[in-house]
Every structure is written in structure tokens, then in C-alpha cells.
Design a protein with these regions (language model features):
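Beta-propeller blade signature
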Residues: 187-190, 234-242, 286-293, 338-344, ...
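Short glycine/acidic-enriched loop and turn motifs that connect beta-strands
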Residues: 179-182, 225-230, 277-282, 329-334, ...
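Blade-level signature of beta-propeller repeat domains, shared across WD40, Kelch, NHL, RCC1
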Residues: 123-124, 130-136, 446, 466-501
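Repeat-based blade/solenoid architectures
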Residues: 144, 151-163, 200-210, 233, ...
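Beta-strand-rich domains and repeat architectures in extracellular enzymes and scaffolds
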Residues: 112, 153-183, 205-207
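A short helix->beta-strand "capping" segment at the edge of beta-propeller domains
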Residues: 94-103, 141-157, 192-198, 302, ...
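Structural signature of eukaryotic scaffold interfaces centered on beta-propeller domains
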Residues: 107-110, 158-170, 210-216, 262-268, ...
Length: 501
């Protein structure tokens, strides 16, 4: 049995040998957090004390007189008092029936499984259900081994961009921005571990999709590059209809050879930025920032920004500051032009920094620990003359220098008409994959996965055969992690599964 006296704690004693399970302790006294009768009461915080439910001495335990302090140190699951047995049976704890450990593949995690454990023997991980999802308690971090082709997805036509998104309680989707109308662009739903056709939407040489939400409203915006049959040029915002479980037309916005939409929130207000590429043959036109009007339920013009063949917008925040960076591709005479980073000040975006780019097609912002990076995809250098290759040029990674208050070049990577970067993580490892689209001779070019290796920067680890690669998207399901890429040169997109160990 146990006997407690409220005195100062003993020194910690670590035995040299394992405590034998066969040793009888009947009639023994254990002093927990006490120095017996030497000095006063023990008022410290006792940590790492585990009592076995149903032990015969539990009822003899006494805690400190400061009960508020004692509550702080007792796990919630152990705070219930034991139920006294009717006879001489063992003490019963009301939570014991819920302390179950499940083996095998990932079981469901709902309110009825809340508090239960799952041991993943394959990945050597222990998880607890919080009533919604499995939370890792102890897990061996996954490492990327290789990739295998998982699905070849036949698309309506060549695909200029992909957007993967999740609608709560409905599922995982992928929207493809397809070149031709008819048949337009398609939305696919992840069903039985594959993407299957779900909805077709009329589009006009669609370039990209953007998924976003405002409160409970769910939207999907398409950037149309061409005018419709009646010569009207606009891009469209679609809204999710919960009853029909389909996207329906919500708002049309006049655009000019739109390449990209970017959705973001600043101080609780929702915005949309469109990258207008050209108007006729004029590439030096305004791109537009729209603000959501909660009263009318529509997006309205908030600001115009001069751009040159704008291809992509990327929004990001650093602390209290919000930024928007544009990829300028062509000014009518050259691809060697500045792309600009803007900062939000006094209700509008103002120029923060200009960076020389070469047919810039994409920006990708990402963070590794407390370091912030911007990856730039350069597609073409018009200043290079034959026999040199204008498509084999460096794309660059920039890092925010807090002291200098600007982005400085961190690393150059040789790419082949790069048009997209995608950042993703596997376990504790971070990766970048580039979409190489053309090497000056062929569209059959390897796209490369680079792994972050600290002082070395990003190092090539996987070479993936692609054809006219245009866009990469990373996503994860309960069955694993995937990369999906689109081709601008064939009506086929591919899903690759990440194999880990």
C-alpha cells in the first residue's frame, strides 16, 4: 500500500537494474514527492506520475492540500474518481472501456471513436482520435523514395492549368483549364481513389482556375483567354450550389486575355486579382484588383496596376504585412523586363521591389522554418541569340532578407522554359518541382524535383519525364500523397503517387 506525507520531495533515484515484476511489495510504503518527516509540506508540481487503474492502493492515495494546483498536473483522462466496487473486486474506472487500441489500416474517426487509439504497424505510428481526425502521438517521419504513375487522366483538350480543392462534406476535386470550346473545361471528383468526370463547364481557351471561399460561400473562378462566340471577352466566377451539388454561374467580369486569378483576404476583406495579359496586340495594360462588396454580394474594382504581359499573381503575408507579386512576361519588344512585388499600405498596393525577369511565368512563395522564399519560373530570354538556347535559362529562388527589407537571390537553377513551381513536403523534408515545358527542340523534357538540403539549397533528386508540362499540383488523401501535372501539348494529365518509406 501507499502512505503519503506532505513534505518536501526526495532526491530522484534511478535504479541500475529493472524493477522486478515478481517482487512482493505487500505492506510496503512508498513516499511520492516527499522527504518523509524531515521538512514541512511538499508544494512543488509533480510530473510524470502514472497510476495503474484498478490498483489496490489507489484509494489510499492522498494529494496536496492545494487542490487547484493538483488539478493542473493531472491529465484530463485521469481526473475521474474510481467507481467503488460492490464487494472486494477491483476498482473500476469509467474511462477504461474507451481506452482501445485499434490495429490495421486507418479506421474511421468520428465522435463515437473519440479518445480511442490507433496503432499503424506499417508506419510505426500511434494516433488518437479527437472526434474528427487522427492526431499523431508518436510517428516515424515518412521519407520520399520514388514516384510511380498512378492515373492517366484523359482531358477534354490540352490543359493549361489545374486546381485541386476540397469541398467539406462533399469531397476532393480537380478543375482542368482546357484549351478548346467546345467541349470546354472539366471538373473531376476523387471517387474510389481515382479522378472521374463530374461536371463540364463552357470556357474559352481557359488558362487557370482559382478556388476560394467567403464565409460559407464556395467559389471557382476561371481565367478565359479568348472571347466567346459573340465577341464578348470575360472571365467567370462560379458558385457552388449546395442543393444541386454543382457549380453555377455567379458573376461575369470583363478581362483581357486573362491568364490567372489570385484570391486573398486582408483585414477580413476578400479580394480577387486578375492577370490581364494583353488587349489586342498591346501587352502593356492594367491588371485589376477586385474587392468583395458584402452588401451587393459582388466583386467591384478596387485598384488597377500597370502590367506587361501579366502571367501570374501570387499573394503572401509576412507578419502584419501583405504582399502581391506579378510575373510580367513580355512588354511588346522584350521578355527581359522587371516583375514587381507590391505591399499593401493605406488601403492599396504600392511598389515594394522590382526584380529583373526573363519571360516570367510563375511565382511560388513558401516558408521553411522562419525563412521566406520566392521561386521564379523564367520561360524565355529574348536577348539570347543563336546558336545559344533562349529556353535553357536560369530560374531563381529569392529569400527575404529582414535586415535589408528586400528579397535577395538565394539560388539559380537551370530550367527549360519553366512555367510553374510547386512546393510540397513529405515528413520533415521539403521539395520543389519545376514544370519544364520546352528545351528549344522538343516538348519531351524532364521536369525535376528538388529537395531542400539546408546550406546546399535545393538539390535535384528526381527526374520526371513530361511532355509540354504546364502545371503541377500536390495533394494528399487518406491513401497517400500525390503530384498531378497537366500538359499543354496533349489531352492528357497524369497523377503520380509518392512512394515513401
Amino acid at each position: 500500500m501507499y502512505e503519503c506525507t506532505h513534505q518536501e520531495p526526495r532526491w530522484k533515484v534511478i535504479t541500475d537494474a529493472v524493477f522486478p515484476t515478481s517482487l512482493t511489495v505487500t505492506g510496503s510504503r512508498f513516499y511520492v514527492g516527499s522527504r518523509r518527516r524531515r521538512k514541512g509540506f511538499f508544494t512543488g508540481l509533480l510530473r510524470q506520475l502514472v497510476l495503474l487503474p484498478g490498483s489496490d492502493a489507489t484509494s489510499r492515495m492522498c494529494t496536496g492540500m492545494n487542490f487547484n494546483l493538483a488539478v493542473l498536473s493531472i491529465p484530463k483522462i485521469l481526473q475521474d474518481l474510481p467507481v467503488k466496487p460492490a464487494g472486494n473486486g477491483l476498482l473500476k474506472y469509467p474511462y477504461e472501456a474507451d481506452m482501445k487500441v485499434t490495429l490495421g489500416s486507418r479506421p474511421p474517426c468520428t465522435k463515437s471513436e473519440s479518445g480511442q487509439f490507433w496503432f499503424n504497424a506499417a508506419q510505426k505510428g500511434l494516433f488518437i482520435c479527437n472526434g474528427d481526425k487522427w492526431i499523431s502521438l508518436l510517428e516515424v517521419e515518412e521519407r520520399l523514395d520514388y514516384l510511380e504513375e498512378y492515373q492517366s487522366l484523359a482531358t477534354n483538350s490540352e490543359t493549361m492549368g489545374i486546381e485541386v480543392f476540397v469541398i467539406p462534406d462533399v469531397g476532393l476535386f480537380a478543375a482542368t483549364a482546357n484549351r478548346y470550346t467546345p467541349p470546354g473545361s472539366a471538373i473531376y471528383k476523387w471517387t474510389d481513389e481515382k479522378f472521374v468526370a463530374y461536371q463540364n463547364i463552357p470556357t474559352y481557351q481557359a488558362q487557370s482556375w482559382k478556388f476560394f471561399t467567403i464565409g460559407k460561400k464556395i467559389f471557382l473562378a476561371v481565367a478565359n483567354f479568348e472571347a466567346n462566340e459573340r465577341g464578348q471577352e470575360f472571365s467567370v466566377i462560379y458558385k457552388w450550389n449546395y442543393r444541386k451539388e454543382k457549380f453555377t454561374v455567379y458573376q461575369r467580369i470583363n478581362t483581357y486575355s486573362a491568364r490567372d486569378w489570385e484570391a486573398f483576404v486582408i483585414d477580413g476583406e476578400a479580394f480577387l486579382a486578375v492577370a490581364n495579359h494583353r488587349k489586342g496586340n498591346n501587352h502593356n495594360i492594367d491588371s485589376v484588383i477586385y474587392r468583395w462588396n458584402a452588401r451587393t454580394g459582388l466583386f467591384e474594382t478596387n485598384q488597377t496596376i500597370p502590367t506587361s504581359g501579366a502571367y501570374d499573381w501570387e499573394f503572401f503575408s509576412i507578419g502584419p504585412y501583405s504582399f502581391l507579386v506579378v510575373a510580367n512576361t513580355f512588354n511588346g519588344t522584350s521578355t527581359t523586363i522587371n516583375s514587381h512585388i507590391y505591399i499593401w499600405l493605406s488601403g492599396a498596393f504600392q511598389l515594394f521591389q522590382s526584380i529583373l525577369t526573363f519571360g516570367a511565368a510563375d511565382w511560388e512563395v513558401f516558408q521553411i522554418q522562419d525563412r521566406v522564399f520566392l521561386a521564379l519560373a523564367n520561360s524565355y530570354d529574348s536577348t539570347i541569340v543563336a546558336p545559344n538556347n533562349s529556353f535553357a535559362i536560369n530560374s531563381s529562388i529569392y529569400e527575404l532578407n529582414i535586415t535589408a527589407q528586400m528579397f535577395v537571390k538565394f539560388q539559380d537553377i537551370l530550367t527549360y522554359s519553366a512555367v510553374d513551381w510547386e512546393f510540397f513536403s513529405v515528413g520533415e523534408d521539403n521539395f520543389l518541382v519545376v514544370a519544364n515545358s520546352f528545351d528549344g527542340v522538343t516538348f519531351a523534357v524532364n521536369s525535376i524535383i528538388y529537395r531542400w538540403q539546408g546550406y546546399e539549397g535545393f538539390v535535384a533528386v528526381h527526374r520526371l519525364p513530361t511532355f509540354g508540362c504546364r502545371d503541377w499540383e500536390a495533394f494528399t488523401t487518406a491513401a497517400g500523397s500525390y503530384l498531378m501535372y497537366s500538359s499543354a501539348k496533349e489531352p492528357l494529365s497524369r497523377v503520380l503517387k509518392l512512394k515513401t518509406f
